[in-house]
């Protein structure tokens, strides 16, 4: 049985107190522990893990959808995937010392189960599923946002493969109902080493300039500068 002190410490860490302590116990119980019980009455956390995975996806998706209204779908998907991945969940699990509270069988304990990424990630999902069952959607949303927002923000700052042209077009369409135009100003250099200069125009005004080794890269640079101009 999980000690009351241990339960209270974990609840304090996630800032949520369970009405039904059995749900917390179940969330922390690995199947290796359940299998070693003679009466087999200790449920493992796999069902709660299934539920927590779904709830986490919804809450994180909704948060990044609200917080980053100008990011294209591909970037939203990238951020969510990074945050809810096994690696992302393991980072959260280690931050709250979740491994210290897990109930493991003897074999899993000997093999270092408390530090295994897969176990930490699965138990993290089970814990969120337990919060949802105990307190409902608003409760689990608050827990998830408190734990995950810093990691979401970090993932959002990693602008891997950002399509600035798409982002600029979506921003201008949403705000003004119109799209930008890209104007090639000049191209310099020999064919094998050309440099292009492009301006992003909107309703007759230049809102960004960019240079690149191709017209596409120059347009992306111009769109990036235009976005920075709009955010000033």
Swiss-Prot record:
Q: In the Enzyme Commission scheme, what number(s) does this protein have?
A: 3.1.26.3
| Cofactor dependence | Mg(2+)
What Pfam families does the database record attribute to this sequence? Answer: dsrm, Ribonucleas_3_3
One GO cellular component term of this record is: cytoplasm
Sequence ranges assigned to domain DRBM in this UniProt record: 163-232
Listed GO MF terms: double-stranded RNA binding; metal ion binding; ribonuclease III activity; rRNA binding
Q: Main site of residence?
A: cytoplasm
Highest taxon of source: Bacteria
What is this enzyme's catalytic activity, as reactions? Endonucleolytic cleavage to 5'-phosphomonoester
What GO biological process terms does the UniProt entry carry, in alphabetical order? mRNA processing; regulation of gene expression; rRNA processing; tRNA processing
Q: Which residues form a coiled coil?
A: none
Q: Which residues form the RNase III domain?
A: 7-136
Its keywords, alphabetically, are: Cytoplasm, Endonuclease, Hydrolase, Magnesium, Metal-binding, mRNA processing, Nuclease, RNA-binding, rRNA processing, rRNA-binding, tRNA processing
Quaternary structure and interacting proteins, as annotated: Homodimer.
The family annotation for this protein states: Belongs to the ribonuclease III family.
Recorded protein name is Ribonuclease 3
Native organism: Syntrophotalea carbinolica (strain DSM 2380 / NBRC 103641 / GraBd1)
Gene name? rnc
């Amino acid at each position: 049985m999980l000690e009351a002190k241990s339960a209270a410490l974990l609840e304090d860490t996630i800032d949520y107190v369970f009405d039904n302590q059995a749900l917390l116990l179940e969330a922390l119980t690995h199947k290796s522990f359940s299998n070693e019980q003679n009466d087999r009455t200790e449920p493992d956390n796999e069902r709660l893990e299934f539920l927590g995975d779904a709830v986490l996806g919804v809450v994180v998706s909704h948060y990044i959808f609200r917080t980053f209204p100008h990011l294209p779908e591909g970037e939203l998907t990238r951020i969510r995937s990074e945050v809810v991945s096994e690696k992302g969940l393991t980072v959260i699990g280690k931050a709250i010392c979740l491994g210290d509270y897990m109930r493991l069988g003897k074999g899993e304990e000997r093999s270092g189960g408390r530090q295994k990424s897969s176990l930490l990630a699965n138990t993290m999902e089970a814990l969120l599923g337990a919060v949802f069952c105990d307190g409902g959607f608003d409760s689990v949303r608050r827990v998830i946002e408190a734990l995950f927002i810093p990691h979401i923000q970090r993932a959002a700052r990693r602008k891997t493969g950002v399509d600035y042209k798409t982002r600029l077009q979506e921003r201008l369409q949403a705000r003004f109902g119109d799209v930008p135009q890209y104007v090639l100003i000049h191209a310099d250099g020999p064919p094998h080493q050309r440099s292009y200069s492009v301006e992003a125009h909107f309703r007759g005004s230049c809102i960004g300039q960019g240079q690149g080794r191709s017209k596409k890269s120059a347009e992306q640079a111009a769109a990036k500068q235009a976005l920075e101009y709009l955010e000033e």
